[in-house]
Amino acid sequence: MELDDFNSRILSQIFDKSWKVRFEAYESLLHALNRALDDSDVCFQPWIHDPALWKQGLCDSNVPTQEHAVKSLRCFLDKSRQKGVNSAKSFVVAPLLEKCLPSPRQSIRDASHQALLILAKSDALDYVLEGLFSAARVKHPKQAVASIKELNSLLENFGIPALSPIPFYKLIPTLFAQSDKNIRQEASNLSITLYAWVGNAFKTHVFPQLKQIQVSDLEASFQNVTSRTTTGGHISNSLNTQEVVLPSFSSNAKPKPHLSSKSSSQGNTLQRSTSSFSTPNRKVSQPSDFSASPSRSIVSPAKNIVGSTPVDVLSKLTPEFHTALSSPKWKDRKEALESMVPVCSNPVYQEGDYSELLRVIAKSLKDANVVVVGVAALLLTHIAKALRKGFLPYTGIVLPSLFDRFKERKSSLVHSLLDAANAIFESCGLNDIMDETLEFLKHKNPQVKTETLRWLNRCLQLTDVCPPRASLETLCSLCVTLINDTFEPVRMATTNVLATLVQIFSQPVLSKYIVGLDPKKLPKILELSKDITVNAHPNQPSRPRLPRVASPLKTSPVKLAVTPQAPSPLPSSNPSQASLTEESLSTRSSPTKPSTTSLRSQSLVNRFASSTLKAPSSSSKGVSNAASSKQSFPSSPSISKKLETSRLSTKKLPGSTMKAASALKEYPQQQSMKSGGEKQDNLVTITMSEKVELDLLREEKAIRQVQEAEDALERERLFREINDLQIQNAEMKEQVYEKESTISQKEVEITSLRNEKDRLSTRLQQVLLELEKQHETNEEAMDIDLKVPESGAIGRVTTRATATTAMDESGNAGMVSSGIHSVSTKPSSYGTRRSLAGSMLQKPTQFSRPSFMFSPEARDNWRESHDLSSHLWEQIQRMKKA
């Protein structure tokens, strides 16, 4: 009796409106099922006979109640054996997959997973698989993802010997066609697991139904998968020691594979958790006869190029190829382009004109079908990597079409386009394609601007050559405009580009190119630049320095060298020569200089003097004669001609002073000369006039530098003024627009008022005409009513007067007055009666009046009391007079 009462109480409580009552009912049921030994217990009987009762708890809206219901079902299936499973399998699978498996609570998901495993092991696998394949195709992403995870778990636990792969072959292409990235990610995991069981049969059945990029990503993932065989009742679940990178087709986020390292006596293996459910670890067995097929990389770089044979790609451009490209069916166009992929993937091409092929690709990049665009981007990637620098003449053909497709929102297509753009950058460099890139920063589509800025930022970080000055000015001016764009991704991408430029050129150099930048945004740019690493720097020499060349003002170079005398083993043996050397040294080391000479110029002059007149070392084989060199300079016609030329260039050509200075500066050079088998050293000297000329040139250079600094400040001031004027112009335009809007609004109001005025004037004229007609009619009626006949009326009045006298004598005065009134108002003829009837039966109007009020006194009273304005009455009187 107590158990019967318990069952009846539970069955009544699970349908209660209060969630607490339902929670307590399932909690009590769970305790009772845990205490029971098998399905012979009485608490199992209601649920075996009526398994539809489980739907109430599995679909409960309260999460704790649902959790206890799922746990009770798991315990029921575990202890009721085959009898309970057979009764409940057709009722509980659908609620478990729809409500419990996608639940946000982990305990509910685990209990649901365990319940489904029990059903699958108890000869109810067909029900479970049928429900899972149906739930994996639903539109609800969470339910579909949970079902795919459960399928993956069942495939790992039972394997292909127990599960048929054919339903999986039909399901996987459908999953890859879904728009949700999580569904496609789980489809990739399921494909990896299925490939481990069936091998190349997966490619045969599934790859023809997938996109090319999906096939490539799956093949890259299949590299690390090993076969799975059943050994001793254990399911193998092993991967190579390399990490599995799962593909992502429509998400910018990179998925993180759930990999855990495990050490064992047999070696280190990586076990991948394909679902969020807890599954026991199983023993890993190595494959016996299985070899995964090598993956085909889409943009893999060419290897062994030196030994590769050039491929004739242009021979594939047959008339059939062009016919297929012009087909209205997108599949024909896609197949035509795919036929070129194996040929174009070769690393070396034969020499030829590839403009026709690239025009075909550029046209395909504009195709309406995104699949065709993806294949065209793949072809462009292969061609750019194969041609390398030879691709430079064709950049103008494909770059506009390539950048214009950045407007696509499908991330997989954008990734393919970015791969092609990266291949072009690696082949041609950034500076050669900078002009085409900057044009698309002015595009009207914000998505195009965003992706172009992001790609440009990556190129600036990777390139080792600084952009030229003209491109830098254009880029900075565009960035100053785009950083105030209304689209947030454009602003963020522009900020990153400016941060990269700051890291390359430094803030002081870049500040003169971003004059109009908002000062509030500069700190963020500087903060971002600290975390950016670049390879290009402006002070980094891009090419080795060439030796100095003579000035173009001279027809032939002049060597300021003195032929030395015979070498002397003891330079100080000749006292006259030594004294002359000291005198020359004192004369040349302390020349008379202007007061404006800088310290740097003095040090350079001293260095020249000391380098030209110092005594030779002991290892020298000859010594120069200072006296002879001092005397030889004035007598040399070439030197005098050179000085005259330099003075003329200083006076007449101020812009070429640096060239003159380079012509006048002659550094010491050692020139080996063979004369009788001996080498002699030539020393280059400089005269006082040359030193003075050099100081003048340096002063001119300093003055020019000061002028350039002033010009830069003036330029910056003008830029700021231009910016202020532009802001004022924009404000004035806005004010003018507001005023024009106000004026147009007032004009509309005036027009409406004029129309209302015309309508009221017309109505007033109509009212006046109606009043005039009514007034004339009333006057005629009044004249007829007041008209009394000369005969008949007097007789009646006399008769009435007699009767009145008689009645007055009898004292009935009231009747007399009444009789008089009735006589006075009685019509005298038929015409009078008709006039009165017409006056009384006429249609009343707003201004109609009774006929007895048309006497002068009644008219005045009516005019004062009636609701008619005095102005209207005056108008009526004037119209009557007229």
Curated annotation (Swiss-Prot):
Keywords: Cytoplasm, Cytoskeleton, Microtubule, Phosphoprotein
GO terms of molecular function: microtubule binding; microtubule destabilizing activity; microtubule plus end polymerase; microtubule plus-end binding
Ranges annotated as biased composition (Polar residues): 266-297, 819-832
Sequence segments annotated as region (Disordered): 250-297, 562-678, 809-833
Modified residues (Phosphothreonine): T279, T650
Phosphoserine modification, residue list: S293, S300, S551, S556, S590, S649
Major subcellular site: cytoplasm
Example of a GO cellular component annotation carried by this entry: static microtubule bundle
Subcellular localization(s) per the UniProt record: Cytoplasm, Cytoskeleton, Microtubule organizing center, Spindle pole body; Cytoplasm, Cytoskeleton, Spindle
One GO biological process term: microtubule depolymerization
InterPro entries associated with the record: ARM-like, ARM-type_fold, TOG, XMAP215, XMAP215_CLASP_TOG
Signal sequence region: none
Comp. bias (Low complexity): 579-601, 609-640
Function: Has a role in sister chromatid separation.
Protein name as it appears in the record: Phosphoprotein p93
